[in-house]
């Protein structure tokens, strides 16, 4: 889990737009965040396997 201070800092509106960055809405992780879902790759995988994300399924070819 991310530090609460860093999560709060990321939620504040930055002075300049380029200073803003994405964090996972579930765990607060700052890297590998999918904007469409607002989740990091780890949380996205866990929720997809649990069937909590509608329309997402494991690919097979």
Swiss-Prot record:
Q: GO biological process annotations for this chain's record?
A: translation
Alphabetized UniProt keyword annotations: Metal-binding, Ribonucleoprotein, Ribosomal protein, RNA-binding, rRNA-binding, Zinc
Q: What residue intervals traverse the membrane?
A: none
The record's Pfam families line, in alphabetical order, gives: Ribosomal_S14
Q: How is the cofactor bound?
A: Binds 1 zinc ion per subunit.
Q: Which InterPro entries match?
A: Ribosomal_uS14, Ribosomal_uS14_bact, Ribosomal_uS14_CS, Ribosomal_uS14_sf
Q: Which GO terms describe its molecular function?
A: rRNA binding; structural constituent of ribosome; zinc ion binding
Cofactors named for this entry: Zn(2+)
* Residue numbers binding Zn(2+): 24, 27, 40, 43
User: Could you state one GO cellular component term attached to this entry?
Assistant: small ribosomal subunit
Tell me if NADP is a UniProt keyword of this record. Answer: no
Q: Which domain of life is it from?
A: Bacteria
Q: Briefly, what is this protein's role?
A: Binds 16S rRNA, required for the assembly of 30S particles and may also be responsible for determining the conformation of the 16S rRNA at the A site.
Q: How does it assemble?
A: Part of the 30S ribosomal subunit. Contacts proteins S3 and S10.
PANTHER family (alphabetical): 30S RIBOSOMAL PROTEIN S14 (PTHR19836), SMALL RIBOSOMAL SUBUNIT PROTEIN US14M (PTHR19836:SF19)
Could you say which protein family the record assigns here? Belongs to the universal ribosomal protein uS14 family. Zinc-binding uS14 subfamily.
Q: What is this protein called?
A: Small ribosomal subunit protein uS14B
Give the lineage.
Bacteria, Bacillati, Actinomycetota, Actinomycetes, Mycobacteriales
């Amino acid at each position: 889990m991310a530090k609460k201070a860093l999560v709060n800092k990321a939620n504040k509106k930055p002075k300049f737009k380029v200073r803003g960055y994405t964090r996972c809405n579930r765990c607060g992780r700052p890297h590998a965040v999918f904007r469409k879902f607002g989740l990091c790759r780890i949380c996205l995988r866990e929720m997809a396997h649990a069937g909590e994300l509608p329309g997402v399924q494991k690919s097979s070819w």
